[in-house]
Amino acid sequence: TKHPRPTTNNPENCFEYFFAQRESVETIVYLYEVVECRNPQDLLKYDIHGSIVISMFEESWFRLVTKQATGTGKTKVLSVLLVWSYFHKTYEDDSDLSRNFLLITPNIIVLDRIRTDFDGLKIFFDDPLLPPNGYDDQNWNSDFQLSLHIQDEVGTLNKKGNIFLTNIHRVYDRKDSHPSYDDENTMDYFLGDKPVTKTQNNKVVLRDIVRDIDELLIMNDEAHHIHDSKLSWFKSIQDIHNNLLQKNCRLSLQIDVTATPKHDNGNIFVQTVSDYPLVEAIAQRVVKRPVLPD
């Protein structure tokens, strides 16, 4: 659907999601809502080649991965899915989804890029994500009340919903996780723990907060970093899920977006449900075509 979004220079300007963005969102919504997939076993019936077995799924919770080439708008996909989960939990009876979201990035560079969209929750109001109040007899704008918490700067938790935006290092449980040569980022292993700086010296520890809430949906940007169950990133999510199980709850869903959903051996993640490669993005002029000098 095209959404009118006039500007000074172009009064007829319209906003429209790319096909690949819509495909990623629609695939996840279809698997969850239409065919009601809730665990790794439910995905096996869609393997038409019969090459996937349950032992290939290293997690016991429901995880879905979308492959999107760099520069094709992964943040847009995450924002749509976040709104979908929020209103599903708000308006649907017995919804298993969540109004609390842990959005994990691999490093500060990626976090700062996403933060420009999420600061002030502006992406949800700049993009056509919220239907007007009264549509389908619901107060969409009024009911969309989320609090944004960045890194360990956690304010009062909002009973109506929270977004925790962080890099993965804030989620590690340092008591159980020590720097290792096998880590994706070996800097701490070789150089030791980073010194505490003014911006790191926070009173609230994010990893303790997310382990204490009763409902949570996790989103991972640049999710190719979770390619091994031995890595601290995977173990941190597993720990969150296990804590929820102890409270008779569970992780609502894990959604991963990455341009390279592959293990070190080259095998694609079995949880991958949509694929938008760079070659296709270039051909459709979604990203710039590289030019080689003579």
Regions found by a protein language model. Name each.
Residues T1-D294:
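RecA-like P-loop NTPase motor core of helicase/translocase proteins
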